[in-house]
Structure formats: C-alpha cells, structure tokens
C-alpha cells in the first residue's frame, strides 16, 4: 500500500534527502503536503515535481508569492500559511506518515499533532523530545502512533536493538557516536575567533547552518542524548557519547553478555530516511555501498568537555529534568542565531546557554503550556544576555 506523506520542512537538507528517496520509489510513496518557512521558490519547484495537495509556508506574503507561481504553472496545489496550517496538515486524514524535519522549537506543535492523530512519525525534529519528552511519548503511546527515528544515530540504535521491548533488559548501554565537528583538533585558545562559515563546514555531513553550528559546539550530540533517553527509555547514565571522526559507525548498542552491535554506512542521511520510510522493509536509498576495504582507519576518543562545554550543559540539563532541557534548547537557538548573524562570538554560545540555565529556576512542567512558557522565558533571557554581550572579535583578513 502506498504511503501518503506530509513532509514538514521540505526545503531543508532532510527534506531534500527525503524527496530524493521518495522520487526513487513512486510506487511506494506519494506526497500529500509539503511545508517551508520562507523558501518559497524552492517550495514551488518541489510542488511542481511532486504535486502535493497542500503546501504550507510561514506567512501571507510568501503564500501569495507561492500561489501565484503555482497557478501560473497550472498547479492546483492549495497554499496555506501559519502555525495552525502546519498542525492541520500533520493530523489530516490525507496522510498516514509525517516526516518531522522542521528545525527547532517550531516543529513541536505539528509533530505533537501528528502523534495525537496516531500517525506514523519519522522524527528528525529532536527538539520535540528535548522540549517535551514525556508529553510527546505519552501522546505516541496513548494514540497508537508509530515513532521511527530519522537522526542517523538514533536510527542506528533502533536498527541494533531487539524489536521486542521485553528484551530491552539485556541492554547495558547505548553509545552515540559523534564526528567531533570541524574543531575537534583546533587549539582551544583560538575558538573565540571561529567564524560562522568555519563552523558550518562539517567534515563529513551535509547539513543546514543551524545544525552545523550545533555539531561544531557538540550541542547537537547533547540534544541527541536527551532524545535517546526518551525514545529508548534509558537513563542518562546508560547513554554514552564517543567521538568517531570517520562517521562510518553511526552508533552502537552494548549488551550485558559483552556483545556490541553497531550500524555502519556511508555518511548520507538518505540511508536512515529510507530505512524509516520503508520500515520494516528495505529499499534503495541511492547511497553507495560501504567499501570496508577502502577504510584506512576507524578511531575513537572520549569527548573533551572543556572544548565542548555545550555537551556538558546538555547532559546536566537531562540530569536535572523539569524544564531544564526546554530552556537549554531555547537559549541555544537564540545564541546560535546571534552567532550566525555575527552578533556574538562562537564561545559565547555556551556562555549564553549556561547563563540562562543559571538564571531560570527549574520546575516540573504540568503540561505543554508550562513547557512553552519556559521556552519563551529562556528565549527572552538569552536575548537580554546577548544584547549586553561585548561585540565579537573582528574577523581577520589576509
């Protein structure tokens, strides 16, 4: 039976990779809805190729632009805009599968709506679990939704774990691998001089700018630890992080009998996306087969928390519980945005997040409204801290 997809965040890197896989298997997958924020021209191109029933954008001006271009091209795709439209296409009867690929907290509401509608959810928006893990997982369970992780690390763990949840007691721990990003060996004293372009040059993966910065600070790995805690139901002390610069082993599961299972593959997001789209079957993802004979080295090292303070902050937030993870994520989003706009330096990202976590009293949320209130308060505090921060160093020229 053909799966009907709503693709949240279709113009980003995950969206591109998803549509590449979809295009390879038109007999298996079709598109009900595509969504973007402001990249209207790219959304138009996607709509003309995949002919969704609905397209959603962030605002009325972008909607008018997209609709005009689609009508001129003879497309009948309905164009909607705004947060409620994202929720509507996520819970619509027109789709059975929702690919949640919106970056940041903006992806929470539509992802949660998909869970409450009992959809098959391919989760690439880790913020949904970082912000509201208990609420989200309760919705998945209570409404019979199916959650399939798309992040390469979590998808790798999913593939290495037993299908029967009753057998999870045999697991000792899970190990998330990390490339270490572009600054794994850079002198720590020079990190204050890092530019946005340098931070966005990931050594192995092709990603959007925000997640590239998160990878450079290793905040991304910290968020993934929190995500893994909720998806797999393991305490933080049973989730390890290991730097693996080659990005060939995507994660591992260690069992009590001494066995360690790992998932390997070329670093290409189409592999975990194809796995989740077709699960429990396997389909061609368009990715080259891994040639083990060509791999010169597989190396591993423990993370340096002095070099990567954001990772330490994320682990601390998981340990503290309450609203700490939501505040961590919100402060980080504001700080990364400021860094990309060159309003703060690279090391100020961690400093801003730390200051917000220290300033915001932790508490247990009673529901989604409490989570969203904590998110808003953390963003306000982060913006205030950044406004008072000294200007970053001027980029050196040769």
UniProtKB/Swiss-Prot annotation:
InterPro entries: DXP_reductoisomerase (IPR003821), DXP_reductoisomerase_C (IPR013644), DXP_reductoisomerase_N (IPR013512), DXPR_C (IPR026877), DXPR_C_sf (IPR036169), NAD(P)-bd_dom_sf (IPR036291)
Pfam families: DXP_redisom_C, DXP_reductoisom, DXPR_C
E.C. designation(s): 1.1.1.267
NADP found in the keyword field: yes
First-level EC class: oxidoreductase
Residues annotated to bind NADPH: 11-14, 38-39, 125, 127, 208
Catalytic activity: 2-C-methyl-D-erythritol 4-phosphate + NADP(+) = 1-deoxy-D-xylulose 5-phosphate + NADPH + H(+)
SS bond list: none
Keywords assigned by UniProt, alphabetized: Isoprene biosynthesis, Manganese, Metal-binding, NADP, Oxidoreductase
Residues reported to bind Mn(2+): 151, 153, 224
Molecular functions per Gene Ontology: 1-deoxy-D-xylulose-5-phosphate reductoisomerase activity; manganese ion binding; NADPH binding
Binding site for 1-deoxy-D-xylulose 5-phosphate: 126, 152-153, 179, 202, 215, 220-221, 224
Entry annotated with the keyword Zinc: no
GO biological process, one term: isopentenyl diphosphate biosynthetic process, methylerythritol 4-phosphate pathway involved in terpenoid biosynthetic process
The protein's annotated pathway: Isoprenoid biosynthesis; isopentenyl diphosphate biosynthesis via DXP pathway; isopentenyl diphosphate from 1-deoxy-D-xylulose 5-phosphate: step 1/6
Cofactor(s) named in the record: Mg(2+); Mn(2+)
Record-stated family: Belongs to the DXR family.
Annotated HAMAP family: DXP_reductoisom (MF_00183)
Role this protein plays: Catalyzes the NADPH-dependent rearrangement and reduction of 1-deoxy-D-xylulose-5-phosphate (DXP) to 2-C-methyl-D-erythritol 4-phosphate (MEP).
Protein's name according to its UniProt entry: 1-deoxy-D-xylulose 5-phosphate reductoisomerase
């Amino acid at each position: 039976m053909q799966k009907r997809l709503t693709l949240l965040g279709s113009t980003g890197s995950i969206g591109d990779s998803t549509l590449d896989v979809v295009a390879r298997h038109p007999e298996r997958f079709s598109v009900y809805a595509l969504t973007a924020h402001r990249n209207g021209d790219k959304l138009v191109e996607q709509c003309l190729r995949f002919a969704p029933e609905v397209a959603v954008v962030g605002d009325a001006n972008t909607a008018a632009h997209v609709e005009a271009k689609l009508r001129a091209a003879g497309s009948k795709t309905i164009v909607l805009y705004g947060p409620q439209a994202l929720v509507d296409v996520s819970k619509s009867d027109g789709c059975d599968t929702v690919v949640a690929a919106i970056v940041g907290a903006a992806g929470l509401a539509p992802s949660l709506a998909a869970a409450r509608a009992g959809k098959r959810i391919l989760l690439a928006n880790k913020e949904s679990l970082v912000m509201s893990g208990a609420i989200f997982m309760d919705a998945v369970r209570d409404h019979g939704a199916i959650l399939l992780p798309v992040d390469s690390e979590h998808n790798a763990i999913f593939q290495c774990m037993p299908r029967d949840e009753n057998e999870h007691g045999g697991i000792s721990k899970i190990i998330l691998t990390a490339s270490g990003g572009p600054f794994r060996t850079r002198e720590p004293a020079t990190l204050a001089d890092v530019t946005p372009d340098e931070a966005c040059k990931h050594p192995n993966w092709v990603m959007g700018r925000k997640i590239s910065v998160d990878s450079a600070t290793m905040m991304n790995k910290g968020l993934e630890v929190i995500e893994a805690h909720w998806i797999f139901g393991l305490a933080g002390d049973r989730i390890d992080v290991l730097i693996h610069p080659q990005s060939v082993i995507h994660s591992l599961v260690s069992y009590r009998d001494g066995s360690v299972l790992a998932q390997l593959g070329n670093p290409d997001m189409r592999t975990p996306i194809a796995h989740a789209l077709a699960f429990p079957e396997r389909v061609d993802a368009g990715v080259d087969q891994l040639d083990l004979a060509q791999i010169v080295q597989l190396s591993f090292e423990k993370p340096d928390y002095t070099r990567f303070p954001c990772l330490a902050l994320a682990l601390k937030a998981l340990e503290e519980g309450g609203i700490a993870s939501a505040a961590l994520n919100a402060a980080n989003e504001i700080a990364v945005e400021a860094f990309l706009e060159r309003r703060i330096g690279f090391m100020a990202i961690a400093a801003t997040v730390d200051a917000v976590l220290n300033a915001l009293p932790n508490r247990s949320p009673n529901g989604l409204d409490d989570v969203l209130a904590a998110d808003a308060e953390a963003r306000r505090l982060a913006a205030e801290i950044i406004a008072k921060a000294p200007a970053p160093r001027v980029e050196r020229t040769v």
